[in-house]
């Protein structure tokens, strides 16, 4: 685990990604998260296991290229993101959608 995230594992995971492709992965116990672009696989594994109390058996990460963004005559780049697909052990799950009993 890198020294950067040793103190605060909650800073590793930014948010879960809820897309059509990511939702299909839920059937086979795969969850997709947007993570800090400096996080390594051991950091992501430690953060998911500690925050959600589950057992991680595999992680795939990808760094898509940054996209250009233009507002008027000013151009810039969007923030760099890293996607992590986390595979959980059999019998473990993360509740992404809270049950609404209203």
Swiss-Prot record:
Highest taxon of source: Bacteria
GO MF terms held by the record: rRNA binding; structural constituent of ribosome
Transcription as UniProt keyword: no
Pfam annotation, one family: Ribosomal_L23
GO BP annotation list: translation
InterPro entries: Nucleotide-bd_a/b_plait_sf, Ribosomal_uL23-like, Ribosomal_uL23/eL15/eS24_sf, Ribosomal_uL23_CS
Keywords associated with the record: Ribonucleoprotein, Ribosomal protein, RNA-binding, rRNA-binding
Any one Gene Ontology cellular component term annotated for this protein: ribonucleoprotein complex
Self-association and partners: Part of the 50S ribosomal subunit. Contacts protein L29, and trigger factor when it is bound to the ribosome.
Function in brief: One of the early assembly proteins it binds 23S rRNA. One of the proteins that surrounds the polypeptide exit tunnel on the outside of the ribosome. Forms the main docking site for trigger factor binding to the ribosome.
Protein family (similarity comment): Belongs to the universal ribosomal protein uL23 family.
Name of the protein: Large ribosomal subunit protein uL23
Provenance organism: Prochlorococcus marinus (strain SARG / CCMP1375 / SS120)
Gene: rplW
């Amino acid at each position: 685990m890198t020294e950067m995230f040793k103190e605060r594992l909650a800073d590793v995971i930014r948010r879960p990604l809820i897309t059509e492709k990511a939702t299909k992965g839920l059937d086979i116990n795969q969850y997709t998260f947007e993570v800090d672009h400096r996080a390594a696989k051991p950091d992501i594994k430690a953060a998911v296991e500690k925050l959600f109390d589950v057992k991680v058996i595999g992680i795939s990460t990808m760094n898509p290229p940054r996209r250009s963004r233009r507002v008027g005559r000013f151009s810039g780049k969007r923030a760099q993101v890293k996607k992590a697909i986390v595979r959980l052990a059999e019998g473990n799950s993360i509740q992404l959608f809270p049950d609404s009993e209203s």
